[in-house]
Amino acid sequence: MASAQLIEQLKNVEATFQELTVRLADPDVATDPAELQRIAKARSSLEATVQTFHEWQKLTRELKQTEELLREVASDDPELEAMARAELEQLRVRQEQLEEKLTLLLLPRDPNDEKNIMLEIRAGTGGEEAALWAADLARMYTRYAEKMGWSVRLASLSEGEMGGYKEAILEIRGDQVYSKLKFEAGVHRVQRVPVTEAQGRVHTSTATVAVMPEVDEVEVVIDPKDIEIKTARSGGAGGQNVNKVETAVDLLHKPTGIRVFCTEERSQLQNRQRAMQILRAKLYEMKLQEQQASISSARRMQVGTGSRSEKIRTYNYKDNRVTDHRLNQNFLLEPILEGELDELIQACIGLYQKELLAELS
């Protein structure tokens, strides 16, 4: 049975939901698009909790009615009693499931969960093979995003000398992108025979993934004096003019040493805007990392640290196996590389929620 504290929390959520519903119908709110969007978003974030609470209330009433029926027929009708007991058991199981779901729905929410992201993939140890592996990861995340109905765009790219990517930044936009992909941050290790390996020996290479929530100018303020910008001729889109006009932008943030090189847009202005967007995301991620480091010193969670240096996964081609070290669980390699990440990601979310519940209790 749900605790009095849980029920009180749910009643407060329900009251807030009803208040937001009333405000949405206010003519004054309807004339303010920004306020209308804010209220609609806040209401939407509570909808699943309220609907589940209503389902729990209905089921609890049914359970009480069944208990009363059981008391009435206990000695008169053995067959009806057996049916009532079976139904009562089913209702109790369902009630327990709903209470567990409601507890999870009331967990503190990450304010970044609904945001779009910049997903950065950098080749790590392993030379040219690491660059090829980084490109494979970029393809994997692109496939996953497409399956989720999200849009993917290459925001920045530095190619390897023999192919692959030294560094790639994907801009991924859609519903709840950060909430799904934030657990992908860390070191991804691959064990396979490189195409350049004549002896058939297995090599180990790595690539590092960073997941940066998209932020606006209000959330991260950058002093123009801290920025140094150089331009260069682009090797990207642009047809015959590609090497005649300096459209590429090389941006340096002097206080942190962060450098962003953008060539993917057609004009210098667009590349400059894109570089600033990436810089803001990188600075915000640094702030998140600092916050997470202070939290991690107080608790040690298997998932959710988001550290670039944490080895989270090994992809073993010989055994057709992917091992997630946080979950201590194996998955088939080929579906994962084709973007079938949902089972793995949901498992990470489940573990994170379980650890958060344990910490709160």
Swiss-Prot record:
| Keyword Transferase listed | no
User: Which residues are annotated with the PTM N5-methylglutamine?
Assistant: Q240
Subcellular location(s): the record lists: Cytoplasm
Q: Which domain of life is it from?
A: Bacteria
Tell me if Ubl conjugation is a UniProt keyword of this record. Answer: no
Per the entry, what this protein does is: Peptide chain release factor 1 directs the termination of translation in response to the peptide chain termination codons UAG and UAA.
Gene responsible for this protein: prfA
Upper classification of the source organism reads: Bacteria, Bacillati, Cyanobacteriota, Cyanophyceae, Synechococcales
For this protein, the record's SUPFAM superfamilies field holds:
Release factor (SSF75620)
Record's family?
Answer: Belongs to the prokaryotic/mitochondrial release factor family.
Please give the organism: Synechococcus sp. (strain JA-3-3Ab) (Cyanobacteria bacterium Yellowstone A-Prime)
State the name under which the record lists this protein.
Answer: Peptide chain release factor 1
Q: Name one GO molecular function term.
A: translation release factor activity, codon specific
